[in-house]
Amino acid sequence: LCILTAIIKHPSFHKMEKSILAKLNNIIFLHINKISDYYKSEFWFDSNHGVFHALAMLNISQIYKEGPNGIDVKEIGVEYLKTSLKGILSIEEGISLEQSSYYHQLGIELVESIDDSYLQMIGINKNEFIDRMILANYWFTSFENKLVPIGDTSVISKAAKQHVLSDEKEKLKTFTHGGLTVVKSKSENNTSYFAMLHRKKRGPHGHFDALSVVLEKNNSRFLIDSGGPYDYGSEMRYEYFMSSYAHNVLLINERPHQKGAIFIGSRQMNSDVFIVEAEHK
């Protein structure tokens, strides 16, 4: 719909043959109907795909105020955008709720691209929220800006340099809403890193289990929960990820667990000892 909007707004659009215009109108109405159905299904409410659907509706609403069967195109676009943004972003914690540190990076770019007026509808100040998302990247990266390999995050993924600007004196951070606790210790030459997932349920782009662990010591990774060694765009990446559970979770009675987790607590005992507690539902 975004491409079709650009075509229609081009000065040469009115010179097109009527048969082509009719085909374009038919395609646009089919798209409006499909996105309206997606909205009613609520299936994409906690995914970035829902945001893209909503933005497509808002784009085409510049030209088509009403779709087939009296659909209010802009109203659905606005409501869909508000709902899906709240589904993929924790306004309280300033992070993406999609179960992948890679998608936190996409979340930064996505928020940057959305008009301020729509973000303000759900209580987000664009610049302030992006700053908080960038601050969170301190906890989502280990050495050399490498992203913590959680869920659909390739082990070779990195955060952009301009999106890792913070430094922290604290070593322990829990994102309760995001379902993640991180212990991070930096020295001049290395970073020691531990992360544990304790989400209430699987999020988009996450593995189908709970309580997976990531462990790095002296810049070497010992345990990972990742989308594998394949870069984005590789056919193998998606197949590898979707066929896998996280690679380091306990099997109870030789069976994987898919019902989410309950976070109990996290605390620092002394300078080098930390306790993170969670349990399977």
Task: Describe every region a protein language model picked out.
Residues L1-I130:
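Aromatic-lined, polymer-binding surfaces characteristic
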Residues L97-K281:
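Extended polysaccharide-engagement surfaces of secreted carbohydrate-active enzymes
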